[in-house]
Each structure stands twice: as C-alpha cells, then as structure tokens.
Amino acid sequence: MDNPFDLSQISAYSDWRARKLEAYPAEITDLRVPVRRLDEPTPAERTALKARIDIFNMAMVEVDPAGIQTQALLSFTRALGLQRTDANLFADASAVSRIAASRRNPSAEGCVDAGSEPPGGATLGDFLPYTDKPLSWHTDGYYNAPDEQVGAWCLFCVRAARDGGENGLIDHEMAYLRLRDESPQHIAALAHPQALSIPAHVQEGRTLRAASVGPVFSVRQGYLHMRYSARARHVIWRDTPDTYAARAALDRLFSRPDVFTFKLVMKPGEGLVSNNVLHCRTGFADDEDPSKSRLLYRIRFLDRILAD
C-alpha cells in the first residue's frame, strides 16, 4: 500500500508532494468559510470547511460572535466528525477552555480564572496560553501520552485584544515536505520514538501530568501527525547529531517564505478549526476592563477531521 510518509517509498512521496504543492501559494482568505449558524452548519458549509481542511489541514470560520457558545461549539465540531474531546487541565466539564490572560483578582464574568484553578498548586498564570506573553511554535498537546495525542482543535474569538495577539499557522504536512526535501535524515531523526521527551509536571508533590516520550512525526491511521514545541525549557531532545541537525532545520523553517505561513489577528466571530497544525501567537495588550479583555474558546479532540 502506498505511503508517502515512508522514506523508502520515493514514488508515493513524489506524487503526494506534487498534489500538496498544487494548492500553494495561498492566502488566509483562501481558508475562509462563512457559517450562518455555528450550532447547525449547512451541508454546503460543512463541505466547504472539509474541502479546505483536506487541502490545508485547517479552515477559518466566520460566524456571529453571539453564537459562540459551548453547546454550539460542540454541535459544530460534531458536524465535522469530532467526538472524542481532550479534557485538558483547565477545560470545563464540556472540555471547553476559555483562553484569556490570567488575572489575580478576577471580578468580571467571563474571566477564565474565576473558580477554575485546580488544587495542587497549578495556576493559569503558570501556563503561557493563559498569559499575554508570546507563544512559540508548537502543536497542541505535545505533552500528552502517545495514545492521547491531539488530532484536531477549534479556536473561536469572543473578544479581541486591544493590540497584538497575531496567530501564525503552518500546515504540518508542508513543514514535513520542506524538511524531507532538505534531507530525509531530518525526517528519520524526528520520527525516532524517543525524539522528543517532555518531563512530568509535578507541583507540591502532586503529578499533574506524567512524562511524555515520543516522535515528532508519526503516521496515525495513514495520516501524518506532528508533536512539537519550540520551547527551550521543559523539553528534552534526543542527544544525537541527526536530531540536533533536524531541530536546527525546523528552527530555520519558521522564517522560510516557501513554507507559506498564514497570519491572522482574530476578530470577534472568527474561528479556526484544524488537524492540529503548527501555530504560534505574538504577545498582546489587553483592555484594563476585564469584560473587554481578549477571550477565546478552545476545544481539543483526539479525533482528526477526515475528508468525506
């Protein structure tokens, strides 16, 4: 069976590569799909979303900001075939995370840290997504166990920051393509089962998350999966020359124009849904009024969005 991600299958890779590059160059507007009702996308809207995700592994959604509610998000993602949620540390009972910069003394409704701090010493401000600081390139859930990897996620903007907060997005398949073209050894190193280790997260003697060891690139049910963080702290790379070379190539990749980085400052009513593509975020400045501060809703899934 043809597998373009098998380094020994040169012909299968060449065919896949040609098909992949047909869609590029592309702009963020090429990902855009207006959706009238988030809780009930029409067959045409669903088809348009899946078509973009099939090509780019992501789509941009435009909806009425008032429609961005927990149950609407769950209905929308179920319409795309996503069922198994990833109940991460600060998600609510429906697996929805409210992403905002943590405030020590929240007073307004909608502040994500109001009553959401778990026991054991973990606080929202300890985690970069819940601050106004920049987020380096990563895929979601890179610290999850191998059998609990994040396959897809959605992210919707309820309120924008006063300034900043630009997202960068790169299709992980395009990253794979450029790295493999540079050297198949990069792929071999990053596909090693011990390529990237994330130490356990322990606070006050309580293990909040076990250690995670695994590859950067893997193939799951025939599809490419990427597990990556550009962070310098709390990550351990396999100590080999090939791994260091592959890491350096990845670092260079993020400034290359031919990897086709999509950039977006999300506005209220805009959303992203993706098969866990590479993404980053610049720092931002919030409004002093908590009721006007940046707020996004996110759900992670163990499933992947499949083409019809």
Predicted feature descriptions by range:
Residues D2-T47, R52, S97, A101-R103, ...:
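Active-site environment of non-heme Fe oxygenases that use a 2-His-1-carboxylate facial triad
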Residues T29-L31, K50-P65, L73:
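N-terminal, charged low-complexity regulatory/assembly segments
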Residues A59, A66-L82, D86-R98:
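Long, mid-chain structured domain cores
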